[in-house]
């Protein structure tokens, strides 16, 4: 099994509900280590650039607006198969389809306000981590 890193964002809706600690607890119970974290309020240009892959999709303007409406908590998670593990913990994009006990089933309100973002693959994870964190802003937990 491979030790991987993935980017996770706790979105404005979940930050506003004050459930950051509960979400972090789920990461840790699943064996994921939080090796970098920061809270920030994304600017419109940041959100547009980060979600540029969706630029031609009809939901893009609403996504950018949503992601800039309040602070987000951004973290790098590390662990065995971190990408898949995080996506399992998050649950389906649509909270109505998410399994009970997943973050989205428990904390999300809608497909738009769905509490969390997670990288969908190794290359995306590298790009997304580099978007928010400089190399010296995360810590290698291997061997600790």
UniProtKB/Swiss-Prot annotation:
Catalytic residues identified in the record: 117 (pros-phosphohistidine intermediate)
InterPro entries linked to this entry: NDK-like_dom, NDK-like_dom_sf, Nucleoside_diP_kinase, Nucleoside_diP_kinase_AS
EC class: transferase
Pfam families: NDK
GO MF assignments: ATP binding; metal ion binding; nucleoside diphosphate kinase activity
GO cellular component: cytoplasm
Entry binding sites for ATP: 11, 59, 87, 93, 104, 114
Name this polypeptide is given: Nucleoside diphosphate kinase
Keywords assigned: ATP-binding, Cytoplasm, Kinase, Magnesium, Metal-binding, Nucleotide metabolism, Nucleotide-binding, Phosphoprotein, Transferase
Domain of life assignment: Bacteria
Family, as annotated: Belongs to the NDK family.
The species this protein was found in: Coxiella burnetii (strain RSA 493 / Nine Mile phase I)
